[in-house]
Design a protein with these regions (language model features):
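Residue-level signal for short, function-critical loop segments
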Residues: 56, 137, 170
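Extracytoplasmic/secreted envelope proteins and their assembly/folding machinery
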Residues: 52-56, 96-99, 118, 122, ...
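Active-site-adjacent structural segments surrounding the nucleophilic cysteine of cysteine proteases
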Residues: 1-88
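Active-site-adjacent substructure of cysteine-protease-like catalytic cores
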Residues: 113-167, 198
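Noncatalytic regulatory segments and standalone regulatory/sensor domains
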Residues: 7-39, 43, 47, 144-148, ...
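Mid-length scaffold segments of soluble, non-membrane domains
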Residues: 81-114
Length: 199
């Protein structure tokens, strides 16, 4: 089963414009749907909500209606899943509080995984597992050479042959957002070896 898709920004079809700088996030016409306090709040936070989007997709995959993006972001911030730094920067998603929230709020078994080779991901998906994987955001561009690994989260939900199937909440087109597919070796170039495994 392919999980329902949720993007970091509410207007999934306009994420490409937001990333290209031709549309300000504050001008996303669907921002009120997010639960943000205002357009400026939405613009400040949405770029950091890849983890929230992945958690929402993981809940939806299990038939659970997910909370609005900013309702979940506020809950996770309260739990330490996001940290607001004195300089205004936002740090997160921090995995352990997210795992605790999945358990406490929904009874979902999840665990933080580190030092996990890309080759081990298919085994984690067996039997309906999901993996929120840390990758470089350049994963949306086929053939791109990432300057580093990590910094962004995607929801890996399936395997087809040697391809990993995943949703990318900051994909800039339908093809790079929903059920994106990459060979395992190609995925590994972007992958930081860590994430959250859900059963």
């Amino acid at each position: 089963m392919i999980p329902p898709f949720h993007g970091q920004w509410e207007s999934a079809e306009r994420i490409g414009e937001i990333l290209a700088g031709t549309l300000r996030a504050a001008d996303d016409p669907l921002w009120p749907r997010s639960g943000a306090a205002g357009a400026a709040d939405y613009e400040r936070w949405a770029d950091h909500l890849c983890g929230v989007a992945c958690l929402r997709m993981a809940l939806a995959a299990q038939g659970i209606t997910p909370p609005r993006a900013f309702d979940l972001a506020r809950e996770l911030t309260h739990r330490g899943g996001y940290v607001l730094r004195p300089d205004g920067d936002i740090r997160g998603l921090i995995y352990a509080p997210a795992v605790a929230w999945l358990r406490d709020a929904h009874g979902i078994a999840a665990e933080v995984r580190v030092d996990v080779a890309a080759e081990a991901i298919p085994e984690m998906l067996a039997g309906g597992g999901l993996f929120i994987a840390s990758v470089h955001p350049a994963i949306r561009r086929a053939g791109a050479e990432p300057p580093s690994q990590g910094g962004h989260l995607v929801l890996v939900f399936g395997v087809q042959g040697d391809l990993l199937r995943f949703h990318n909440p900051s994909g800039d087109s339908t093809e790079t957002q929903m059920d994106a597919r990459l060979p395992l070796a190609e995925f590994a170039r972007f992958y930081a070896g860590r994430g959250i495994a859900l059963r």
